[in-house]
From Swiss-Prot:
One of its GO terms (cellular component) is cytosolic large ribosomal subunit. Coiled coil: none annotated. Gene3D superfamilies: 3.30.420.100. This is Large ribosomal subunit protein uL18. Part of the 50S ribosomal subunit. Contacts the 5S and 23S rRNAs. It comes from Metallosphaera sedula (strain ATCC 51363 / DSM 5348 / JCM 9185 / NBRC 15509 / TH2). Keywords: Ribonucleoprotein, Ribosomal protein, RNA-binding, rRNA-binding. InterPro entries: Rbsml_uL18_euk. It holds the Pfam family Ribosomal_L5e. GO terms for biological process: ribosomal large subunit assembly; translation. This is one of the proteins that bind and probably mediate the attachment of the 5S RNA into the large ribosomal subunit, where it forms part of the central protuberance. Belongs to the universal ribosomal protein uL18 family. HAMAP family: Ribosomal_uL18_A. GO terms for molecular function: 5S rRNA binding; structural constituent of ribosome.
Length: 195
């Protein structure tokens, strides 16, 4: 840490690497509604936030753990779960009266094809407008076809590794090769359950 009379200590959340205050400042100046997306090592969290001078107000939110209520048996943080969580949050935001929002990615550095954009794709598909350019969202990955193809290939080549890698899927009663069909079932369940 620097010493001397000219050293200014940064804000605590900046020191901890939790908040980019310049980006936060631009969001506050904009005063538009935001869709806040946070990816953890296990889960996906999506919140729709309105600006208020006293503090931000969360209007609608969804967590990838909630997908279990709709019959989801897959992983809670892959691209498919990201899309479903974004879709669920978008439907809830529409119910709350939000029609558009800007993306708040936090400290995440955007890269083409990242999971965070699958969340935004889900939000857009639910009917909430979010400005998003070409970010490499692949519809096959969105439905989990890449996982199903890999599982099929791995089961033939190395059954032990297959059972190890997909143990959570198998323990929950989902054959990973059936993930695209399961995705459609859960998406329909979300559509019917949230309207």
């Amino acid at each position: 840490m620097a010493h001397g009379p000219n050293y200014k200590v940064k804000y605590r959340r900046r020191r901890e690497g939790k908040t980019n205050y310049y980006r936060r400042y631009t969001y506050v100046l904009n005063r538009s509604d935001r869709v806040v997306v946070r990816l953890t090592n296990k889960y996906v969290i999506v919140q729709f936030v309105k600006f208020d001078p006293k503090g931000d107000i969360t209007v609608a939110a969804a967590h990838s753990r909630e997908l279990m209520k709709f019959g989801w048996k897959g992983d809670e943080n892959n691209s498919t779960a990201c899309y479903l969580t974004g879709y669920l949050a978008g439907l809830r935001a529409k119910k709350a009266g939000m029609t558009s929002a800007s993306a708040d990615l936090g400290l995440f550095t955007p890269t083409k094809g990242a999971r965070i954009f699958y969340v935004l794709k889900g939000v857009i598909d639910s009917g909430v407008k979010v400005p998003m350019g070409d970010v490499g969202v692949n519809n096959d990955r969105l439905a989990g076809k890449h996982i199903a193809e890999y599982a099929k290939k791995l089961e033939q080549e190395d059954p032990d590794k297959y059972r190890g890698l997909f143990s959570r899927y198998l323990a929950r009663g989902l054959d990973p090769k059936d993930l695209p069909a399961h995705f459609k079932e859960v998406l329909n369940s979300i559509k019917s359950g949230e309207k």
